[in-house]
């Protein structure tokens, strides 16, 4: 059975490439008979053209690259979410969807010309070998990784169980240590955090939807139940989506048996329904779903399924607006196409897919329009189409046509400075500054107990000033320290926490100064008292 994906994901030779792509697709799926005689002639003609270029053109031509460009051009003219996966990308994409890969288990960035370890995966090969955040990897089996044109992580990849020796430079040392590491299966975590926000309210942060997400999410639910959770909040902010079934499994945790969660329609208008089962652990308890403008596809499936069944409360800002379903099909040479094969609809019958008539660039940059029209600050600025109005079984008004509008609106960061700092919180900028600190004067933190770090560690002024100076680079000259000091300190401490103790602690710390989390707690208390 082919997997279906809901994923938030660019004209050279369009004419002849169309024939090649269609020919490959139909051949892969055993549908060559669908071609008319004329179609077969065109396909052979186009394939012949590629052969002639390959054999007779005056210069050497990489016809594989021509085909790749052509296929990309074709798919760009279909919809924003139909994509081509080249043979070079195929393994990484497969790993991402599956939720694991073979490697040494590190998060890293290239610092100047050297691989610097941000953190190690818990119980992974590198952690077991004694590698820590702040370490720099200089060699693999004696071959240098540093220097011009030398930095490539390909040498770190290999088969599971194979062994390599890393040359590692630790903070404060001048000796390069030779550390043997055995490659292994590394889980790509979907659940960043699962902990109790209050005595009653459990919290789960989910960053993606992969094949492994269901098992991770179920474990998180079990942890919270054992800790006494009577309510649960699922944070899907900035979650771009992924595997459809994982989203349906998540929604099933909160919906009763036989409740419609979603339906799909293909090109022939054939309908496929997805219903909840009786397996949910929180069917009779309050649930909250957190979304924002970057919550897409599978995240929207969950939010839409619950909202249309009058289950729980959706908190945040209007979601991205993707209602297309992709199916991955192999093209026979290791490459694949992830093609839109259906539209999905929430239980009330609404499509939340945004229009894409103006092209892919405008489609993916639509958030700029949301910013300019004030939607991110005021719910009343959200444009709705009354012809796309629907009612839930309880009579609540919901809209199709572009994302899930939350039940409870929480404004985004206001003003340039707050938006810049929010961007820093969601990207790796602060991580790099913190990692440099760990390699130098902060190396002692690598041995500090987590409780001591949480309870008593304060970010030094020198680190704050270094972050501030680097943050003001580029287009951020107007960024001020006054009024932002407390959040900058928290952001740096959270980045250090992730590199030292794991992502969950980073999430916990950032949540202490998060307006949406504050509003969530208010709603939780109100629900408890009713």
Q: Where are each of the predicted segments found?
A:
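Conserved functional hotspot residues or short segments at active or partner-binding sites
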Residues: 351-352, 356-530
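Extended, small/polar residue-biased N-terminal targeting/export presequences
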Residues: 55-116, 161-165, 169-193, 510-521, ...
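Cleft-lining beta-strand/loop regions that shape enzyme active-site pockets
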Residues: 29-42, 46, 50, 54, ...
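Hydrophobic membrane-insertion alpha-helices, especially the h-region
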Residues: 8-24
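Polar, glycine-rich mid-to-C-terminal structural blocks
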Residues: 298, 310, 317, 321-388
């Amino acid at each position: 059975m082919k997997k279906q994906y809901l994923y938030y994901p660019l004209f050279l030779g369009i004419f002849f490439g169309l024939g090649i792509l269609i020919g490959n697709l139909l051949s892969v799926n055993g549908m060559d008979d669908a071609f008319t005689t004329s179609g077969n002639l065109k396909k052979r003609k186009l394939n012949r053209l590629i052969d002639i270029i390959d054999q007779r053109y005056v210069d050497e031509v990489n016809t594989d690259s021509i085909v790749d460009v052509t296929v990309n051009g074709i798919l760009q003219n279909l919809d924003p979410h139909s994509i081509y996966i080249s043979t070079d990308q195929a393994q990484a994409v497969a790993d991402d969807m599956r939720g694991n890969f073979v490697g040494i288990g590190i998060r890293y960035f290239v610092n100047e010309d050297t691989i610097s370890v941000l953190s190690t995966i818990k119980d992974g090969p590198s952690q077991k070998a004694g590698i820590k955040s702040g370490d720099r990897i200089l060699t693999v089996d004696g071959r240098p990784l540093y220097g011009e044109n030398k930095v490539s992580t390909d040498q770190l990849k290999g088969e599971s169980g194979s062994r390599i020796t890393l040359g590692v430079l630790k903070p404060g040392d001048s000796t390069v240590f030779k550390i043997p590491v055995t490659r292994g299966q590394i889980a790509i975590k979907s659940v960043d955090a699962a902990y109790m926000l209050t005595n009653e309210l459990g919290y789960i942060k989910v960053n993606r939807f992969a094949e492994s997400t269901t098992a991770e999410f179920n474990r998180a639910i079990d942890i919270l139940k054992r800790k006494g959770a009577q309510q649960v909040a699922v944070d899907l902010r900035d979650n771009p989506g992924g595997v459809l079934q994982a989203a349906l499994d998540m929604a099933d945790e909160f919906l009763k048996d036989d409740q419609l969660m979603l339906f799909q329609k293909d090109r022939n208008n054939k309908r496929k329904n997805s219903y909840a089962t009786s397996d949910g652990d929180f069917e009779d308890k309050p649930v909250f779903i957190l979304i924002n403008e970057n919550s897409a596809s599978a995240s929207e499936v969950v939010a839409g399924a619950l909202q249309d069944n009058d289950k729980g409360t959706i908190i945040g800002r209007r979601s991205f607006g993707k209602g297309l379903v992709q199916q991955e099909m192999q093209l026979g040479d290791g490459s694949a196409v992830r093609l839109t094969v259906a539209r999905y609809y929430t239980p009330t019958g609404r499509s939340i897919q945004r229009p894409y008539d103006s092209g892919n660039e405008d489609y993916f940059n639509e958030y700029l329009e949301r910013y300019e029209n004030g939607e991110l600050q005021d719910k009343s600025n959200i444009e709705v189409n009354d012809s796309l109005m629907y009612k839930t079984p309880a009579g609540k008004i919901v809209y199709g046509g572009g994302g899930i509008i939350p039940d409870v609106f929480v404004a985004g960061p206001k003003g340039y400075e707050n938006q810049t700092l929010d961007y820093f919180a969601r990207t790796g900028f602060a991580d790099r500054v913190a990692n440099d600190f760990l390699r130098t004067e902060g190396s002692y933190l690598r041995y500090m107990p987590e409780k001591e770090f949480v309870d008593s560690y304060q970010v030094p002024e020198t680190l704050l000033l270094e972050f501030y100076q680097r943050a003001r680079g580029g287009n951020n000259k107007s960024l001020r320290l006054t009024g932002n000091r407390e959040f900058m300190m928290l952001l740096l401490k959270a980045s250090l926490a992730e590199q030292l103790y794991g992502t969950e602690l980073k999430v916990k710390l950032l949540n202490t100064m998060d307006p949406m989390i504050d509003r969530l707690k208010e709603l939780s208390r109100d629900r408890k008292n009713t």
